Design a protein with these regions (language model features):
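Membrane-interface "cap" regions at the ends of multi-pass membrane proteins
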Residues: 1-40, 181-186, 198, 205-215, ...
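Transmembrane alpha-helical segments of multi-pass small-molecule transport proteins
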Residues: 16-21, 86-91, 102, 113-137, ...
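Extracellular loop-to-transmembrane helix junctions
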Residues: 31-61, 82-84, 221-223, 380
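Juxtamembrane transmembrane-helix boundary signature
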Residues: 46-78, 85-93, 389-394
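Hydrophobic transmembrane alpha-helices that form the core helical bundles
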Residues: 83-115, 266-282, 325
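Membrane-interface loop-to-helix entry segments
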Residues: 122-127, 131-164, 176-177, 214-221, ...
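Hydrophobic alpha-helical segments and their helix-loop junctions in multi-pass secondary transporters
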Residues: 135, 151-177, 182-185, 189-194, ...
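C-terminal membrane-solvent junction of multi-pass transporters and transport-like membrane proteins
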Residues: 177, 328-403
Protein backbone atom coordinates (compact mmCIF):
# COMPACT_ATOMS: atom_id res chain seq x y z
CA UNK A 1 0.00 0.00 0.00
CA UNK A 2 1.36 3.42 -0.95
CA UNK A 3 2.16 5.75 1.92
CA UNK A 4 0.10 8.94 2.20
CA UNK A 5 3.31 11.00 1.94
CA UNK A 6 3.91 9.53 -1.50
CA UNK A 7 0.48 10.57 -2.77
CA UNK A 8 0.35 13.33 -5.38
CA UNK A 9 -1.64 16.39 -4.31
CA UNK A 10 -4.01 18.29 -6.57
CA UNK A 11 -1.59 21.25 -6.68
CA UNK A 12 1.47 19.10 -7.36
CA UNK A 13 -0.39 17.38 -10.17
CA UNK A 14 -1.17 20.73 -11.79
CA UNK A 15 2.42 21.95 -11.40
CA UNK A 16 3.85 18.84 -13.08
CA UNK A 17 1.61 19.23 -16.11
CA UNK A 18 2.14 22.97 -16.32
CA UNK A 19 5.84 22.19 -16.64
CA UNK A 20 5.15 19.51 -19.23
CA UNK A 21 3.19 21.94 -21.41
CA UNK A 22 5.74 24.76 -21.38
CA UNK A 23 8.00 23.57 -24.17
CA UNK A 24 9.81 24.80 -27.23
CA UNK A 25 8.14 22.07 -29.31
CA UNK A 26 4.66 23.42 -28.57
CA UNK A 27 5.64 26.98 -29.46
CA UNK A 28 7.22 25.76 -32.71
CA UNK A 29 4.04 23.84 -33.57
CA UNK A 30 1.95 26.94 -32.89
CA UNK A 31 4.05 28.85 -35.43
CA UNK A 32 2.85 26.45 -38.14
CA UNK A 33 -0.70 27.80 -37.70
CA UNK A 34 0.21 31.24 -39.10
CA UNK A 35 -1.42 30.70 -42.55
CA UNK A 36 -4.81 30.44 -40.79
CA UNK A 37 -4.56 33.92 -39.29
CA UNK A 38 -5.05 34.88 -35.64
CA UNK A 39 -8.75 34.06 -35.08
CA UNK A 40 -8.93 30.83 -37.07
CA UNK A 41 -5.56 29.76 -35.71
CA UNK A 42 -6.72 30.20 -32.12
CA UNK A 43 -9.98 28.41 -32.90
CA UNK A 44 -8.05 25.43 -34.28
CA UNK A 45 -5.85 25.42 -31.16
CA UNK A 46 -8.90 25.49 -28.86
CA UNK A 47 -10.85 22.76 -30.68
CA UNK A 48 -7.83 20.48 -30.99
CA UNK A 49 -6.92 20.87 -27.33
CA UNK A 50 -10.51 20.23 -26.23
CA UNK A 51 -10.50 16.96 -28.16
CA UNK A 52 -7.09 15.94 -26.85
CA UNK A 53 -7.82 17.24 -23.34
CA UNK A 54 -10.97 15.14 -23.03
CA UNK A 55 -9.01 12.00 -23.90
CA UNK A 56 -6.17 13.08 -21.59
CA UNK A 57 -8.61 13.33 -18.67
CA UNK A 58 -10.24 9.95 -19.30
CA UNK A 59 -6.89 8.19 -19.72
CA UNK A 60 -5.57 9.77 -16.52
CA UNK A 61 -8.73 8.93 -14.60
CA UNK A 62 -8.40 5.23 -15.40
CA UNK A 63 -4.94 5.24 -13.84
CA UNK A 64 -6.02 7.35 -10.86
CA UNK A 65 -8.97 5.10 -10.03
CA UNK A 66 -7.13 1.80 -10.51
CA UNK A 67 -3.72 2.83 -9.16
CA UNK A 68 -2.09 1.39 -12.29
CA UNK A 69 0.58 2.87 -14.53
CA UNK A 70 -0.37 3.87 -18.07
CA UNK A 71 0.77 0.63 -19.68
CA UNK A 72 -0.79 -1.42 -16.88
CA UNK A 73 -4.14 0.19 -17.71
CA UNK A 74 -3.64 -0.86 -21.33
CA UNK A 75 -3.38 -4.47 -20.11
CA UNK A 76 -6.97 -4.23 -18.86
CA UNK A 77 -8.22 -4.15 -22.46
CA UNK A 78 -5.48 -5.83 -24.47
CA UNK A 79 -4.07 -8.49 -22.14
CA UNK A 80 -0.58 -8.76 -20.67
CA UNK A 81 1.19 -9.64 -23.90
CA UNK A 82 -1.20 -7.66 -26.06
CA UNK A 83 -0.18 -4.49 -24.25
CA UNK A 84 3.49 -5.04 -25.12
CA UNK A 85 2.87 -3.58 -28.59
CA UNK A 86 1.85 -0.28 -27.02
CA UNK A 87 4.62 -0.40 -24.40
CA UNK A 88 7.19 -0.78 -27.18
CA UNK A 89 5.56 1.97 -29.26
CA UNK A 90 5.52 4.21 -26.21
CA UNK A 91 9.21 3.66 -25.48
CA UNK A 92 9.99 4.46 -29.12
CA UNK A 93 7.93 7.67 -29.05
CA UNK A 94 9.52 8.71 -25.75
CA UNK A 95 13.04 8.20 -27.08
CA UNK A 96 11.95 10.28 -30.07
CA UNK A 97 10.48 13.01 -27.86
CA UNK A 98 13.60 13.06 -25.69
CA UNK A 99 15.76 13.60 -28.77
CA UNK A 100 13.40 16.25 -30.21
CA UNK A 101 13.16 18.19 -26.95
CA UNK A 102 16.91 18.17 -26.30
CA UNK A 103 17.63 19.12 -29.93
CA UNK A 104 15.18 22.03 -30.03
CA UNK A 105 16.20 23.22 -26.57
CA UNK A 106 19.90 23.09 -27.38
CA UNK A 107 19.35 24.76 -30.76
CA UNK A 108 17.47 27.67 -29.19
CA UNK A 109 19.95 28.09 -26.32
CA UNK A 110 22.86 27.93 -28.79
CA UNK A 111 21.36 30.70 -30.92
CA UNK A 112 21.21 32.88 -27.80
CA UNK A 113 24.91 32.17 -27.10
CA UNK A 114 26.10 32.35 -30.70
CA UNK A 115 29.62 33.36 -29.67
CA UNK A 116 30.32 29.96 -28.13
CA UNK A 117 32.24 27.41 -30.16
CA UNK A 118 30.11 24.27 -30.56
CA UNK A 119 27.34 25.92 -28.55
CA UNK A 120 24.57 23.53 -29.62
CA UNK A 121 26.59 20.47 -28.62
CA UNK A 122 27.49 22.05 -25.28
CA UNK A 123 23.86 22.93 -24.52
CA UNK A 124 22.69 19.49 -25.60
CA UNK A 125 25.08 17.91 -23.09
CA UNK A 126 24.07 20.39 -20.36
CA UNK A 127 20.36 19.74 -20.86
CA UNK A 128 20.92 15.96 -20.91
CA UNK A 129 22.94 16.18 -17.68
CA UNK A 130 20.22 18.23 -15.96
CA UNK A 131 17.58 15.65 -16.94
CA UNK A 132 19.77 12.92 -15.41
CA UNK A 133 20.04 15.03 -12.25
CA UNK A 134 16.22 15.44 -12.15
CA UNK A 135 15.89 11.65 -12.45
CA UNK A 136 18.25 11.12 -9.53
CA UNK A 137 16.21 13.54 -7.41
CA UNK A 138 13.16 11.33 -7.89
CA UNK A 139 9.42 11.97 -8.10
CA UNK A 140 8.93 12.77 -4.39
CA UNK A 141 11.45 15.62 -4.38
CA UNK A 142 10.79 16.57 -8.00
CA UNK A 143 7.43 18.20 -7.22
CA UNK A 144 9.07 20.41 -4.55
CA UNK A 145 11.88 21.59 -6.82
CA UNK A 146 9.49 21.84 -9.74
CA UNK A 147 7.26 24.27 -7.80
CA UNK A 148 10.15 26.77 -7.59
CA UNK A 149 11.35 26.31 -11.16
CA UNK A 150 7.82 26.48 -12.56
CA UNK A 151 7.14 29.71 -10.67
CA UNK A 152 10.16 31.24 -12.37
CA UNK A 153 9.12 29.80 -15.72
CA UNK A 154 5.57 31.13 -15.33
CA UNK A 155 6.82 34.69 -14.76
CA UNK A 156 9.19 34.55 -17.72
CA UNK A 157 6.52 33.09 -20.00
CA UNK A 158 4.11 35.88 -19.03
CA UNK A 159 6.73 38.43 -20.02
CA UNK A 160 7.36 36.60 -23.29
CA UNK A 161 3.64 36.58 -24.08
CA UNK A 162 3.27 40.32 -23.56
CA UNK A 163 6.31 41.16 -25.66
CA UNK A 164 5.42 38.86 -28.56
CA UNK A 165 1.77 39.95 -28.71
CA UNK A 166 2.67 43.66 -28.62
CA UNK A 167 4.00 43.61 -32.17
CA UNK A 168 2.22 45.34 -35.03
CA UNK A 169 -0.40 43.17 -36.77
CA UNK A 170 1.04 44.37 -40.08
CA UNK A 171 3.99 42.07 -39.42
CA UNK A 172 1.66 39.17 -40.08
CA UNK A 173 2.43 39.51 -43.73
CA UNK A 174 5.98 38.35 -43.06
CA UNK A 175 4.78 34.89 -42.05
CA UNK A 176 5.02 32.83 -45.23
CA UNK A 177 4.57 29.23 -44.07
CA UNK A 178 3.14 26.42 -46.16
CA UNK A 179 -0.63 26.51 -46.51
CA UNK A 180 -2.44 24.51 -43.86
CA UNK A 181 -6.06 23.39 -43.78
CA UNK A 182 -8.15 24.06 -40.68
CA UNK A 183 -8.67 20.33 -40.11
CA UNK A 184 -4.94 19.63 -40.25
CA UNK A 185 -4.34 22.44 -37.75
CA UNK A 186 -6.96 20.99 -35.39
CA UNK A 187 -5.19 17.63 -35.61
CA UNK A 188 -1.79 19.17 -34.84
CA UNK A 189 -3.36 20.72 -31.74
CA UNK A 190 -5.07 17.48 -30.68
CA UNK A 191 -2.06 15.20 -31.04
CA UNK A 192 0.06 17.11 -28.53
CA UNK A 193 -2.11 16.15 -25.51
CA UNK A 194 -2.69 12.83 -27.27
CA UNK A 195 1.04 12.13 -27.11
CA UNK A 196 0.78 12.12 -23.30
CA UNK A 197 -1.95 9.45 -23.16
CA UNK A 198 0.56 6.59 -22.71
CA UNK A 199 2.19 8.55 -19.86
CA UNK A 200 -0.46 10.41 -17.89
CA UNK A 201 -1.45 7.48 -15.65
CA UNK A 202 2.19 7.06 -14.60
CA UNK A 203 1.56 10.20 -12.52
CA UNK A 204 -2.18 10.19 -11.81
CA UNK A 205 -1.90 6.67 -10.33
CA UNK A 206 -0.27 8.36 -7.32
CA UNK A 207 -3.10 10.89 -6.90
CA UNK A 208 -4.53 11.28 -3.41
CA UNK A 209 -7.85 12.46 -4.89
CA UNK A 210 -8.42 10.66 -8.18
CA UNK A 211 -10.90 12.95 -9.94
CA UNK A 212 -9.62 16.25 -8.55
CA UNK A 213 -5.95 15.54 -9.27
CA UNK A 214 -6.71 14.26 -12.77
CA UNK A 215 -8.88 17.30 -13.50
CA UNK A 216 -6.19 19.69 -12.23
CA UNK A 217 -3.60 17.94 -14.41
CA UNK A 218 -5.90 18.16 -17.44
CA UNK A 219 -6.78 21.82 -16.96
CA UNK A 220 -3.15 22.76 -16.30
CA UNK A 221 -2.01 21.02 -19.45
CA UNK A 222 -4.95 22.21 -21.59
CA UNK A 223 -4.55 25.88 -20.63
CA UNK A 224 -0.76 25.98 -20.73
CA UNK A 225 -0.35 24.02 -23.95
CA UNK A 226 -2.95 26.23 -25.65
CA UNK A 227 -1.02 29.22 -24.33
CA UNK A 228 2.23 27.91 -25.84
CA UNK A 229 0.56 27.38 -29.22
CA UNK A 230 -0.82 30.93 -29.02
CA UNK A 231 2.65 32.32 -28.27
CA UNK A 232 4.01 30.56 -31.35
CA UNK A 233 1.12 31.79 -33.49
CA UNK A 234 1.53 35.37 -32.22
CA UNK A 235 5.28 35.24 -32.79
CA UNK A 236 4.71 34.28 -36.42
CA UNK A 237 1.90 36.76 -37.07
CA UNK A 238 2.76 39.83 -35.00
CA UNK A 239 6.53 39.56 -34.58
CA UNK A 240 7.31 37.93 -37.93
CA UNK A 241 9.34 35.20 -36.22
CA UNK A 242 9.45 31.56 -37.28
CA UNK A 243 12.16 30.30 -34.92
CA UNK A 244 12.51 30.24 -31.14
CA UNK A 245 15.81 32.06 -30.63
CA UNK A 246 14.93 35.18 -32.68
CA UNK A 247 11.58 35.26 -30.90
CA UNK A 248 13.27 35.29 -27.49
CA UNK A 249 15.69 37.99 -28.65
CA UNK A 250 12.77 40.01 -30.02
CA UNK A 251 11.17 39.81 -26.56
CA UNK A 252 14.37 41.08 -24.95
CA UNK A 253 15.06 37.80 -23.16
CA UNK A 254 18.80 37.18 -23.34
CA UNK A 255 20.01 35.20 -20.33
CA UNK A 256 16.41 34.89 -19.17
CA UNK A 257 15.57 33.36 -22.55
CA UNK A 258 18.17 30.68 -21.99
CA UNK A 259 16.59 30.00 -18.59
CA UNK A 260 13.15 29.63 -20.24
CA UNK A 261 14.52 27.20 -22.82
CA UNK A 262 16.53 25.07 -20.40
CA UNK A 263 13.91 24.91 -17.62
CA UNK A 264 11.07 24.11 -20.01
CA UNK A 265 13.09 21.47 -21.84
CA UNK A 266 14.27 19.74 -18.67
CA UNK A 267 10.85 19.77 -16.96
CA UNK A 268 9.13 18.29 -20.02
CA UNK A 269 11.80 15.79 -21.02
CA UNK A 270 12.08 14.49 -17.45
CA UNK A 271 8.51 13.21 -17.77
CA UNK A 272 9.32 11.58 -21.12
CA UNK A 273 12.38 9.80 -19.77
CA UNK A 274 10.74 8.74 -16.51
CA UNK A 275 7.72 7.28 -18.29
CA UNK A 276 9.98 5.45 -20.73
CA UNK A 277 11.38 3.67 -17.68
CA UNK A 278 7.89 2.86 -16.41
CA UNK A 279 6.79 1.56 -19.83
CA UNK A 280 9.90 -0.56 -20.29
CA UNK A 281 9.35 -2.04 -16.84
CA UNK A 282 6.06 -3.48 -18.13
CA UNK A 283 8.04 -5.21 -20.91
CA UNK A 284 10.85 -6.46 -18.69
CA UNK A 285 11.45 -5.98 -14.97
CA UNK A 286 15.14 -6.79 -15.33
CA UNK A 287 16.12 -3.13 -15.08
CA UNK A 288 14.74 -0.48 -12.73
CA UNK A 289 12.68 2.46 -13.95
CA UNK A 290 15.34 5.08 -13.19
CA UNK A 291 18.06 3.00 -14.88
CA UNK A 292 16.02 2.75 -18.09
CA UNK A 293 15.01 6.42 -17.88
CA UNK A 294 18.69 7.37 -17.60
CA UNK A 295 19.54 5.18 -20.59
CA UNK A 296 16.74 6.82 -22.61
CA UNK A 297 18.09 10.25 -21.66
CA UNK A 298 21.59 9.30 -22.80
CA UNK A 299 20.27 7.82 -26.06
CA UNK A 300 18.05 10.85 -26.69
CA UNK A 301 20.98 13.18 -26.04
CA UNK A 302 23.15 11.23 -28.49
CA UNK A 303 20.43 11.32 -31.18
CA UNK A 304 19.96 15.06 -30.61
CA UNK A 305 23.68 15.66 -31.10
CA UNK A 306 23.94 13.54 -34.25
CA UNK A 307 20.67 14.10 -36.16
CA UNK A 308 18.59 17.12 -37.21
CA UNK A 309 15.13 16.49 -35.73
CA UNK A 310 13.73 20.01 -36.07
CA UNK A 311 10.69 18.93 -38.18
CA UNK A 312 8.44 16.48 -36.38
CA UNK A 313 4.89 16.82 -37.77
CA UNK A 314 5.04 13.30 -39.24
CA UNK A 315 6.14 11.99 -35.85
CA UNK A 316 3.07 13.59 -34.25
CA UNK A 317 0.76 11.90 -36.74
CA UNK A 318 2.41 8.54 -36.02
CA UNK A 319 1.68 9.05 -32.32
CA UNK A 320 -1.94 9.90 -33.06
CA UNK A 321 -2.46 6.87 -35.30
CA UNK A 322 -1.17 4.47 -32.62
CA UNK A 323 -2.65 5.91 -29.44
CA UNK A 324 -5.99 7.44 -30.52
CA UNK A 325 -7.64 4.08 -31.36
CA UNK A 326 -5.95 2.52 -28.32
CA UNK A 327 -7.59 4.93 -25.88
CA UNK A 328 -10.95 4.61 -27.70
CA UNK A 329 -10.98 0.88 -26.94
CA UNK A 330 -9.96 1.54 -23.32
CA UNK A 331 -12.65 4.20 -22.77
CA UNK A 332 -15.36 1.92 -24.14
CA UNK A 333 -14.18 -1.03 -22.03
CA UNK A 334 -13.64 0.82 -18.75
CA UNK A 335 -16.33 3.51 -18.62
CA UNK A 336 -19.21 2.06 -20.65
CA UNK A 337 -18.91 -1.71 -20.83
CA UNK A 338 -17.14 -1.95 -17.45
CA UNK A 339 -15.41 -5.10 -18.65
CA UNK A 340 -13.34 -7.18 -16.31
CA UNK A 341 -9.59 -7.13 -17.03
CA UNK A 342 -8.63 -9.24 -20.04
CA UNK A 343 -8.10 -12.75 -18.67
CA UNK A 344 -5.86 -14.00 -21.47
CA UNK A 345 -2.36 -13.16 -22.57
CA UNK A 346 -3.67 -11.43 -25.70
CA UNK A 347 -7.15 -10.06 -26.36
CA UNK A 348 -7.27 -10.44 -30.13
CA UNK A 349 -10.62 -8.68 -30.48
CA UNK A 350 -9.24 -5.53 -28.84
CA UNK A 351 -6.16 -5.67 -31.05
CA UNK A 352 -8.35 -6.08 -34.16
CA UNK A 353 -10.44 -3.09 -33.09
CA UNK A 354 -7.27 -1.06 -32.57
CA UNK A 355 -5.90 -2.09 -35.98
CA UNK A 356 -9.13 -0.98 -37.65
CA UNK A 357 -8.80 2.40 -35.93
CA UNK A 358 -5.12 2.67 -36.89
CA UNK A 359 -5.87 2.07 -40.59
CA UNK A 360 -8.82 4.49 -40.45
CA UNK A 361 -6.58 7.19 -38.93
CA UNK A 362 -3.99 6.84 -41.71
CA UNK A 363 -6.73 7.09 -44.35
CA UNK A 364 -8.32 10.11 -42.68
CA UNK A 365 -5.01 11.98 -42.77
CA UNK A 366 -5.31 12.07 -46.56
CA UNK A 367 -8.92 13.32 -46.43
CA UNK A 368 -8.26 16.02 -43.80
CA UNK A 369 -11.75 16.27 -42.22
CA UNK A 370 -12.69 19.76 -40.93
CA UNK A 371 -12.41 18.83 -37.23
CA UNK A 372 -9.21 16.85 -37.55
CA UNK A 373 -8.55 13.13 -37.70
CA UNK A 374 -8.60 12.17 -34.02
CA UNK A 375 -12.28 12.92 -33.34
CA UNK A 376 -13.80 10.75 -36.12
CA UNK A 377 -11.29 7.96 -35.43
CA UNK A 378 -12.11 7.97 -31.71
CA UNK A 379 -15.86 8.01 -32.42
CA UNK A 380 -15.67 5.21 -34.98
CA UNK A 381 -13.39 2.97 -32.89
CA UNK A 382 -15.46 3.61 -29.76
CA UNK A 383 -18.72 2.73 -31.56
CA UNK A 384 -17.19 -0.35 -33.18
CA UNK A 385 -15.93 -1.55 -29.79
CA UNK A 386 -19.40 -1.22 -28.25
CA UNK A 387 -20.96 -3.01 -31.23
CA UNK A 388 -18.56 -5.95 -31.12
CA UNK A 389 -18.60 -6.33 -27.34
CA UNK A 390 -22.36 -5.90 -26.84
CA UNK A 391 -23.89 -7.46 -29.94
CA UNK A 392 -21.27 -10.12 -30.57
CA UNK A 393 -20.09 -11.21 -27.10
CA UNK A 394 -19.32 -14.69 -28.34
CA UNK A 395 -16.75 -13.27 -30.74
CA UNK A 396 -15.01 -11.52 -27.89
CA UNK A 397 -14.93 -14.61 -25.69
CA UNK A 398 -13.74 -16.95 -28.41
CA UNK A 399 -10.94 -14.67 -29.55
CA UNK A 400 -9.19 -14.37 -26.19
CA UNK A 401 -6.29 -16.74 -25.93
CA UNK A 402 -5.84 -17.96 -22.38
CA UNK A 403 -2.32 -17.74 -20.98
Amino acid sequence: MERQADKLSVTASAVIWFGAAVSVAEILTGMLFAPLGWRMGLLAVAIGHMIGGMLFYLAGLIGAQTGRSAMETVQLSFGRRGSLLFSAANVVQLVGWTAIMIFTGAQAAAALTAGWSGAQTVWGVIIGALILLWLRIGMRNFSKINLVSMGTLFALTLWLSVQVASGEPAAAGQADAEAMSFGLAVELAAVMPLSWLPLVSDYTRRAGKARAATLSATLAYFCTSSWMYAIGLAAALFAGQSEIAPMLQYAGLGAAGILVVVLSTVSTTFLDAYSAGVSFHSISSRFGEVVVASAVTLLGTLLALVFDVSRFEGFLYFIGSVFAPMIAVQIADYFVLKRKPASGEVDWVSLALWLAGFVFYRLMLKWQPPLGTTLPVIAATFALTLLVRKLLPSVGKAAVREG
